[in-house]
Amino acid sequence: MTLKQLILAASLLFAAAAAHAEQTLDISYQRSSTLWILLKQNGQLEQRLKPLGFTVNWHEFSTGLLSSLNAGSVNLHADVADAFALFTQAADAPLTYYAQENSSPGAQAIIVQDASPIHSIADLKGKTVAVSKGSGSNFLLISALHKAGLTLADITPRYLEAPDGGAAFSNGSVDAWVIWDPFFATQQLEHHVRVIADGNDGLTNYNRFYLATTQFANAHPDVLQITFDTLRETGQWVKAHPRQAAEILGPLWGNIPPATVERANSRRSYDIIPVKLQNLAEQQRIADTYYGAKLIPKPLNVSDITVWTPKP
């Protein structure tokens, strides 16, 4: 073999090895995935994962998020509300919890129009309430009704996703709306609404969880460590720079005014912490409540979930 042939062969082997080493990380996000949206915009996660040979593909979901969680087509998933995470467990989806956003109880609420005769949860009896089925807001509604001595049978729940719920609330076809930020903040600052209950009333903590496919988590703990650290640092940055974060997020959230984004972010903790089984009592309470309300098909033991723990 000539020197030229040796050089060519070596080049081909190097190219093949490089191509083999290059891997794709698929990440899903939704409108409420503040930290993912910022990382997609600033490219910081890609920079940190590049030495490991990873490129990142981002996938936005407005609907069908549960299907994507179950299908395994995404490696790291949009952060989901506490209640929503239970549906993945009920579906036996092979997912690993690798991070948690600490409690943000004020980030969702039950609201009515300012002129409404409804002034308390008890006044919801016989009324129509818009809520996203199976969401964290759904649990807030059930908890609020229970505290007032009512059940879902005492109202007419109208199960609508956030955009449709907003339309129904605006045109008066529902009496109340159970909603989360930034939709909640938009209603407060751009419309005449009143809050009749939120999580600060001791009804729900509203945690959020970050999930990975278990196969990916087992194969790439180094990627999870970098992702966890980057999410935590991004959350700290948002809280330390509220106005700057709002000005970045506003256009990315559909041209929401910075003041609205800032109001919404003020109610989110963005405190990224490890998931610990001993701290999931509220998850078990939600699971039991949802099984009793026939929102999930079977009883769940939340301690059965798979958890990945980051290095300190």
Regions found by a protein language model. Give the residues of each.
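Bacterial N-terminal signal peptides that target proteins for export
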Residues: M1-I7
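N-terminal signal peptide c-region/cleavage motif recognized by signal peptidases
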Residues: A15-A18
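Short, glycine-/small- and polar/acidic-enriched structural segments
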Residues: Q23-T151, R158-Y159, D175-D181, T204
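Small-molecule pocket liners
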Residues: L35-W36, S104-I110, V193-R194, Y206-Y210, ...
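Short, solvent-exposed loop/beta-turn-alpha elements that line the ligand-binding surface or hinge
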Residues: E46-P51, D201, Y270-N279
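Pocket-lining segment of extracytoplasmic ligand-binding domains
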Residues: V80-A83, P157-R158, P163-L252
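Secondary-structure end/capping motifs
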Residues: N218-L295
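Conserved C-terminal helix/tail region of periplasmic/extracytoplasmic solute-binding proteins
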Residues: D288-P312
